[in-house]
Amino acid sequence: MRIIFWGTPDYSISSLDILIKSNHEIIAVVSQPDKKRSRGNKLIASPIKSFAEQEYIKIYTPEKIRNNIPFINELKSLSCDLFIVIAYGKILPKEILEIPKFGCWNAHASLLPRWRGAAPIQWSLMKGDEYTGVGIMKMSEGLDTGDLLLEEKIKIDNTDNLNTLTEKLSILSAKLLLKAVSFLEKNINKKINSKLTKQNTLGREITYARMIEKSDFKVDWGNEAIKISRKIKALYPRANTNFRGKNLKILKIKVLTSDEIKNAKYHLMSNYSKPGIILAVIENEGIIISTKTDPIILLEAKIEGKNISTKKQLIQQLKPSVGEYFLD
């Protein structure tokens, strides 16, 4: 099959790589334009563009795709069979969806129609979903509304964060995509639509995974401990707080159970009324902080200007005192 691959972040690389190594032909890659990503305002290529360059694949990085007649005509001239889209970053308009002979196909990192949109992995972690997965869908004009060809579900482990779950889903996306492309090749002359499943027949709630905003990264100590824990995992490694005027990225915490709270070794400060207050500083355990519900132990963090530190190192570096506050 002659394929044009659309993608931008690291997440897309495993899918492009597996297709390159297959018997299919990647005739071009479309990615987002180079962007200023460093303090020196240097233009940096997307991970997919950099990977495609190493593979000597023709690359397009249009500033816009809607009503871009020269670009659309260029795509038509390539006579491709399929568009494969993995985290490209823009919704493809109808005039582009209609170009490939056998449709545009997308691997979406959620159990659709749950978490349609830009940040499905983050929101599945943020909301404490027990399962997630990957769906291969035939793209339509709506936001992740297409009919599904394949789907596979995986359990979200308690230890998963954004990095680990993204890696798992990236590998799963690649595996399912190759399976889907092989199926499409074998069934070129058959009615594919009869093999597809409409999302509204799956009995799942429609939810939307909006883009993560700068304000989302702030830890709200007035929230429930479990929600704080989920946020830290979902936004790893960028969830942050403020201590004595310095930014502190929180990488790992533990929510104390009721039995642990009663454990005499913690000697928690008891006469507190506000969240975000330091309840105890215990050398071999860590810094214990109040929330709306249960206290949490700060296990791993990155202090502004320093490397990642674990609990004992954090105590040495921050020199915190019981009764001080972390600010959101």
Swiss-Prot record:
Keyword Transferase applies: yes
Assigned keywords, A-Z: Protein biosynthesis, Transferase
GO cellular component: cytosol
EC number(s) recorded for this UniProt protein: 2.1.2.9
Top EC group: transferase
Coiled coil (residue ranges): none
GO MF term set: methionyl-tRNA formyltransferase activity
Pfam families: Formyl_trans_C (PF02911), Formyl_trans_N (PF00551)
SUPFAM superfamilies documented for this protein: FMT C-terminal domain-like (SSF50486), Formyltransferase (SSF53328)
Catalytically driven reaction(s): L-methionyl-tRNA(fMet) + (6R)-10-formyltetrahydrofolate = N-formyl-L-methionyl-tRNA(fMet) + (6S)-5,6,7,8-tetrahydrofolate + H(+)
List of residues binding (6S)-5,6,7,8-tetrahydrofolate: 110-113
Keyword Protein biosynthesis (UniProt): yes
Lineage top rank: taxon: Bacteria
Physiological role: Attaches a formyl group to the free amino group of methionyl-tRNA(fMet). The formyl group appears to play a dual role in the initiator identity of N-formylmethionyl-tRNA by promoting its recognition by IF2 and preventing the misappropriation of this tRNA by the elongation apparatus.
Family: Belongs to the Fmt family.
Name listed for the protein in its UniProt record: Methionyl-tRNA formyltransferase
Organism: Prochlorococcus marinus (strain MIT 9215)
Lineage: Bacteria, Bacillati, Cyanobacteriota, Cyanophyceae, Synechococcales
Gene (name only): fmt
